[in-house]
Amino acid sequence: MRTAQALAVCIFTAAQTYAVPPSVILGILHVEGGRVGMASKNTNGTHDLGPMQINTIWMPELARHWNVPEATAKRMVRDDACVNIGVGTWILRKKMNETGSLYKGIAWYHSATPRFGDVYRKKVMTAMQRYRLVRDPKDLVAAAVPRPAKRSPG
């Protein structure tokens, strides 16, 4: 188990690496509600893993990048909070770049289907405001500028 201080280092490192506001990472962590070692089964047969509930659809790409079997990538993402946070933040940055927007990136982290993604984005924004991570969503405008996603997830 990691200490709160170690997790804070993971969050701030991921935020810096992928140019994502730490408050957004914390908001997603709160909404996802995952834990180290957790694997939640989805109706489509995939699983969501660990604190940021990373979908197993990402395992082939991660396994190739890390040059490990998919089962190893899955264990790493599920069982290591820092790896999970790094991968989740990398995915969020990719979605931000695809959509050209922080807000749509947050929605697409969950689903590119507007009726699901928009509800999710609102939950993340509400969590950030509730925990006083931001005063107003406009505080995040500077983060909306697309940047290249680094090639290394996690």
Locate each region found by the language model.
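Catalytic glycan-binding domains that act on GlcNAc-containing polysaccharides
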Residues: 1-153
